[in-house]
Design a protein with these regions (language model features):
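Short beta-strand-to-loop acidic/aromatic patch adjacent to the donor-nucleotide binding site
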Residues: 94-106
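A recurrent flexible, glycine/aromatic-enriched loop bordering the glycosyltransferase active site
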Residues: 161-182, 249-251
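Glycine-rich, basic loop-to-helix element that forms the pyrophosphate-binding segment
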Residues: 71-90
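Active-site-adjacent helix/loop segment of glycosyltransferases
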Residues: 208, 212, 216-261
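A conserved acidic beta->alpha catalytic loop
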Residues: 45-55, 73
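A short, conserved alpha-helix in the catalytic core of glycosyltransferases
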Residues: 174, 180-182, 186-191, 196-223
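Short beta-strand-to-loop element that shapes/binds the nucleotide-sugar donor at the catalytic cleft/hinge
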Residues: 130-146
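Short, well-formed alpha-helical segments that are part of the catalytic scaffolds
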Residues: 12-33
């Protein structure tokens, strides 16, 4: 099973090394207990790093399949991710999934279990693969979810609310790309990240586009990794709304918005 791992980096070498190390270890754990074997191929955009990110990554993982895409420091997050994805698309025929990650996350050894449990749920429930966003917890308090998915309860332009794990996949609207899985058939239909975004929100837009194209957009069952919490936790933000509003949408059809790209 070939997974193209996409990330973009700017002067966060040590975090990038930890992120990749944790991801490789998660794949090893998955492969040890499953007959289906994962083959990760990393496409990393070096957006003008001055901390030797690329060379250190190559040195740390000499036996891994890693492609470095050079940028000039002006790609920013969305631009850097598009560059990495464009390179991966050259090998689209041999890729089964695209996995978008953030370089400041560290992934749990169960991350790929979460991915494939969610994928199997999508196949059983919707008869097709889709887009799956993994919950990321605060590394200092794993009860606090800091990235994952958001939704609108009512009108499209109303306030968004954060979602919490419920030990089962949940339909969602806005996706964070800290651990974002995209089935290749989604890419066949809608392509990659929109060129209309330079830095943030391109991952939100992608979930909406997939949803509008008729693909399931789901959270994972549980947490896939941890990261530094430099935002309000999902739980704290959700508490600013009503308890009812924090429950999330019941069906995709209730939440289908107009395309914003």
């Amino acid at each position: 099973m070939k997974i193209a791992v996409l990330l973009t980096c700017f002067n966060r070498c040590q975090k990038t090394l930890k992120a990749l190390d944790s991801l490789y270890k998660a794949a090893e754990v998955f492969n040890e207990k499953n007959s289906m074997k994962l083959n990760l191929e990393v496409f990393l955009t070096d957006d003008g790093c001055t901390d030797n990110t690329s060379s250190n990554v190559k040195k740390a993982f000499p036996d891994k399949n890693i492609t470095i895409v050079e940028a000039d420091g002006n790609a920013f997050w969305a631009g850097g991710m598009r560059l990495a994805w464009n390179k991966a698309l050259e090998y689209h025929n041999r890729i089964d999934f695209y996995l978008l990650i953030n370089d400041d996350a560290q992934f749990l050894q169960t991350a790929f279990d979460e991915m494939f449990k969610t994928h199997n749920y999508a196949l059983a429930t919707y008869k097709k693969g889709g887009v799956y966003t993994g919950f990321i917890a605060d590394e200092k308090d794993t009860n606090k979810i800091i990235y994952g998915a958001k939704y609108h309860k009512k009108a499209f332009l109303s306030k968004t609310y954060n979602m919490m794990p419920k030990n089962m996949p949940q339909e969602c609207m806005f996706t964070n790309a800290n651990f974002l899985v995209v089935d290749k058939h989604v890419v066949d239909e809608i392509g990659q990240l929109s060129i209309g975004y330079k830095h943030r929100d391109a991952d939100w837009d992608y979930g909406i586009r997939a949803l509008k194209a008729g693909f399931p957009v789901l959270t994972t069952y549980g947490v896939c990794g941890v990261s530094v919490n430099d935002h309000d936790s999902y739980k704290q933000e959700a508490e600013k709304g009503s308890q009812d509003e924090s429950q999330g949408p019941q069906t995709i059809s209730e939440q289908a918005p107009a395309r914003i790209s």
